[in-house]
Amino acid sequence: MFCTRGLLFFAFLAGLDIEFTGLRSNLSGPQQISLFDLPSEWYLKTRQSVQQFTVCQIGLSVFSAIEGEANKYIAHSCNFYLFPTTFGILDSEFSFQASSVQFLNQYGFNYNKFLKNGIPYMNEEQEKKIRHDILTGNWRVRSSPDKDQIKVVIDEVTRWLELAKEGDWMTLPGITGFQAFEVQLVLRQALPNIWTVLKDEGVVVKKVSKQHRWYLQNTSCDRESCWKENILLSARGFSVFFQMLVKAQKPLVGHNMMMDLLHLHEKFFRPLPESYDQFKQNIHSLFPVLIDTKSVTKDIWKEMNFPRVSNLSEVYEVLNSDLNPTKNSGPEIVHASRCEKYVETKCPHEAAYDAFLCGSVLLKVAHLLLQKIYHIDPVPESSFPQYLDVLAPYVNQVNLIRAGVPKINFSGPDYPSIRPPILILSVKRWPGVSEQQVYHKFQNLCKFDVRRLTRSQFLLLTNKFKDARNILKEYRDHPTLCISLYRYWRHSPNVNCLLQVCGIVTAWALLAFILGRSGT
């Protein structure tokens, strides 16, 4: 792999981006994510989508300092096409979402590399099952295409054995990679008088005596136990690199990276737990320093009055333009040799390119923040530790799309909501009105999430204060649609019911008291 353990060890940060076969299940009603959701509710809804779709490409860009050159960084960027391990009992099911396929196809995603040459991967639970089956000899070929190919191979080798002498060998060409381990495992289990070796040209099968076979199994460098460990290592595939990334404990940088973190946990660590707090603890243990460039750029964009941007590429363009006052004094970033594809070529939504943008944006924004502290440009002796210091308020604050809070805090309790207040809509002379009808009624003016409160009342919530003010003003004197600020103690049906019960109890108590006194 391009990214050795040593390269990760000496790196300052790792940019990450992941592409998926789908983003969200088309859930309806209460299962849809909304601005009303608490982080724990948002997590449980999104967890279903993460379990349904899979990762098709991971991009990593590892940034290291260039020795002897101040504030200069070199980026090693690489794409990994992934495909779930199909080995023994493992045969994952996953879905494609048409819009996601269309989107990636629009940007030139190579589905052949994903489906034909994807690197296998598994999480820790899957690895335990496979390890047990391989080491105990309970392993079986499960998929029909593999069974058919294995049958052809066994028939071919069996016919050859009938005429072969001890010491003779034959080659099975075109069998490479992980499949070669599978073929060898089956042949060794099925035929006691052969030995197999993997070479560049394919799997080499040699006829041997049973005594020689025993000797090879127990004394050679390719003895059974070591060989089975190699099979397991091959089956783990990208998961080996994931563990290297975890052990390196470097700052992990992404853009709107919440979905990336969910998939990293589910696909490479463990199945997502039902507990939202447990998920947060697990991620913080794996990656103690997370930085979401979406959270960082949100604040700096308002402060610097930069033009509005809608994606990571546009953020990068603004920071590389003359609009950035530190454009010429900021960190210099170069691409490593053999990683120079992106020097002249822009490849938006290619995972490694977006990972490179994440790391670059972070360094440039950090320099901008540092300059604002010193009030001079260039900043004297700017360094990555200084960058981390100014980024401290953003560490482990991951942006959250469409939820009751704007971000998740992975190193502690989540912050309270800073969304606009909830509004309450009271409807008159509109029998049978639905949430969908209410949504369409206001969508041209502003976008609200709608939740029914009673038969004729609905809660409205937006993520823009301006929209809340506008609709309150627009519908101030409307004859059939009355909109006001929602007050829990005033509008909640539960509170109203409780107050009514209390009123009845109080009235009965008062009546009993009066009747009791009159009886005496």
From Swiss-Prot:
InterPro entries: CAF1_poly(A)_ribonucleases (IPR051181), RNase_CAF1 (IPR006941), RNaseH-like_sf (IPR012337), RNaseH_sf (IPR036397)
Annotated localization: Endoplasmic reticulum membrane
GO biological process entries: blastocyst formation; nuclear-transcribed mRNA catabolic process, nonsense-mediated decay; nuclear-transcribed mRNA poly(A) tail shortening; piRNA processing; priRNA 3'-end processing; siRNA 3'-end processing; spermatogenesis
Effect on the protein upon substituting M259T: In SPGF57; uncertain significance
Catalysis performed (reactions): Exonucleolytic cleavage of poly(A) to 5'-AMP
Pfam families per the UniProt record, alphabetical: CAF1
Annotated EC: 3.1.13.4
Site (Interaction with poly(A)): K294
Binding residue positions for Mg(2+): D17, E19, D260, D354
Family (UniProt): Belongs to the CAF1 family.
Biological function: 3'-exoribonuclease that has a preference for poly(A) tails of mRNAs, thereby efficiently degrading poly(A) tails. Exonucleolytic degradation of the poly(A) tail is often the first step in the decay of eukaryotic mRNAs and is also used to silence certain maternal mRNAs translationally during oocyte maturation and early embryonic development. May act as a regulator of multipotency in embryonic stem cells. Is a critical factor for proper spermatogenesis, involved in pre-piRNAs processing to generate mature piRNAs.
Protein name: Poly(A)-specific ribonuclease PNLDC1
